[in-house]
């Protein structure tokens, strides 16, 4: 029995809520000595092995063109996205990265309108998106509106946002041709495969003593099983059912859930400016999704 349409919106919100927690898990792993490339590699490798149990039979797509599209999906939604984002975090301010990365829904909308005639952008969607983006800015900069420009870092972050936008379009293209789980498995495989060249610059040195620490193991499994395996499958279903524009709009909620998690887990304070930003995000997303 197919889910009612409204449930896909709930799935989108829950998926983005889980992704909002990934920043905290990644921070814990980095504090334990893992590099961003290692975190991504272990995360996608575990997710790939997990999804292989569910979808082991089919190896390839119907033709090499579709296979290349999924290679591109593994790059744009995996290795390139995480590599550029995490590299940018080491170059520019975290606030810059958090804000610029949330332009992904806006970029997705622009690309969707350019490449797909079926995608439409109403005034409500445009104004709602801009209001939500303003809310993201209020949460990220938290009243300190000093944007320190770091050209390389900011361009890398913009590339990450653009990469995710292209990933969304690729999933839309492939969604009608292959099962969602098969597509997601291929994304994980090519994501792992295409991150390997990064280890030529920074060789991988697995430390069993570190990897088996409870905090490291728990957060790696959270990122791999819940945030990757389960959430990527769910998100790809949402993209198929709601369309790239409407689905991507929920990504604006990401900083909101990160803020709440930081308050509950890291005991970080929530200011009035951040609360105002949260209100803008919720109202903006509702406005954009309302028909």
Regions found by a protein language model. Name each.
Residues 1-38, 42, 75, 147-173, ...:
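Glycine-/small-residue-enriched transmembrane alpha-helix faces in small-molecule transporters
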């Amino acid at each position: 029995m197919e889910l009612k349409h409204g449930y896909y919106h709930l799935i989108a919100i829950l998926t983005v809520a889980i992704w909002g927690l990934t920043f905290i898990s990644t921070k814990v792993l980095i504090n334990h000595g893992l590099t961003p490339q290692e975190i991504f590699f272990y995360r996608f490798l575990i997710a790939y092995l997990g999804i292989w149990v569910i979808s082991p039979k089919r190896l390839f797509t119907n033709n090499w063109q579709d296979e290349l599209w999924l290679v591109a999906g593994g790059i744009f939604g995996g290795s390139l996205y995480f590599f550029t984002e995490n590299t940018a975090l080491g170059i520019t301010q975290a606030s810059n990265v958090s804000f610029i990365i949330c332009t992904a829904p806006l970029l997705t909308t622009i690309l969707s309108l350019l490449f797909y005639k079926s995608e439409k952008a109403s005034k409500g969607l445009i104004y709602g998106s801009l209001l939500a983006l303003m809310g993201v800015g209020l949460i990220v900069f938290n009243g300190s509106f000093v944007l320190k420009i770091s050209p390389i870092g900011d361009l890398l972050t913009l590339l990450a946002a653009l990469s995710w936008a292209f990933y969304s379009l690729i999933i839309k293209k492939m969604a009608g041709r292959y099962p969602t789980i098969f597509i997601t498995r291929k994304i994980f495989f090519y994501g792992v495969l295409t991150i390997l060249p990064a280890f030529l610059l920074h060789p991988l040195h697995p430390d069993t003593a570190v990897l088996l620490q409870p905090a490291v193991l728990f957060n790696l499994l959270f990122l791999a099983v819940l945030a990757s395996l389960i959430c990527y499958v769910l998100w790809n279903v949402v993209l198929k059912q709601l369309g790239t524009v409407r689905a991507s709009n929920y990504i604006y909620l990401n900083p909101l859930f990160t803020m709440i998690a930081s308050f509950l887990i890291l005991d970080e304070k929530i200011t009035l400016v951040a609360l105002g930003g949260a209100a803008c995000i919720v109202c903006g997303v509702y406005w954009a999704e309302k028909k």
